Amino acid sequence: MNQDQLKQAVAQAAVDHILPHLDSKSIVGVGTGSTANFFIDALARHKAEFDGAVASSEATAKRLKEHGIPVYELNTVSELEFYVDGADESNERLELIKGGGAALTREKIVAAVAKTFICIADASKLVPILGQFPLPVEVIPMARSHVARQLVKLGGDPVYREGVLTDNGNIILDVHNLRIDSPVELEEKINAIVGVVTNGLFAARPADLLLLGTADGVKTLKA
């Protein structure tokens, strides 16, 4: 199977996993990116079986609405049973790097609200140590240079992602050359830098379940 077929397989597996737990009042948290898009497409076939969704980005909200799935603001929702999203990297503890699509802050907020965070990815995303994929950091624009200097002190090589503004109006620094042995600790250190909104490490709140698309089918890993 090619990469898109693997993504379709894990997206369908996620729908199959959550459907038995949904009812007419259920609201599903939905992530951002190519794998999440496959999940939206698969979920849309069952839109009569749940109430609606909370989107982690404007792009996701647009795709959900195009499928006729109601989109709710998170502030109007008391709880989310599930949040389903992809990842740029995952280790075996289901600590993740996310944010390749620049939606990391809203993704992290929705994940924090959800009872169960299901990550869907193809097998290439599972790594022994995080950091080969550059770590995205969302930054208040005026703090870009200050934050970059602090990230260098932490051992990284930050690169400004030109031409990209997040849905929150901020910029992204992609931090290269990090070997992330202690994801929770590094997540906290980067978030403590003045001017940082958040970073793409999902370690303090990792995924609960990883559905991994492989040539031999979908494998399930639990935290």
UniProtKB/Swiss-Prot annotation:
Name this protein carries in UniProt: Ribose-5-phosphate isomerase A
EC number: 5.3.1.6
Enzyme class, broadest EC rank: isomerase
Chain positions recorded as substrate binding sites: 32-35, 85-88, 98-101, 125
Gene: rpiA
Superkingdom, taxonomy of origin: Bacteria
Organism expressing this protein natively: Pseudomonas aeruginosa (strain ATCC 15692 / DSM 22644 / CIP 104116 / JCM 14847 / LMG 12228 / 1C / PRS 101 / PAO1)
GO cellular component terms attached to this protein's record: cytosol
Keyword Repeat: no
InterPro entries, per database record: NagB/RpiA_transferase-like, Ribose5P_isomerase_typA_subgr, Ribose5P_isomerase_type_A
Reaction equations catalysed: aldehydo-D-ribose 5-phosphate = D-ribulose 5-phosphate
Coiled coil ranges: none
Active site: 107 (proton acceptor)
Entry's Gene Ontology BP terms: D-ribose metabolic process; pentose-phosphate shunt, non-oxidative branch
Keyword vocabulary terms for this entry: Isomerase
One Pfam short name: Rib_5-P_isom_A
Complexes and interactors: Homodimer.
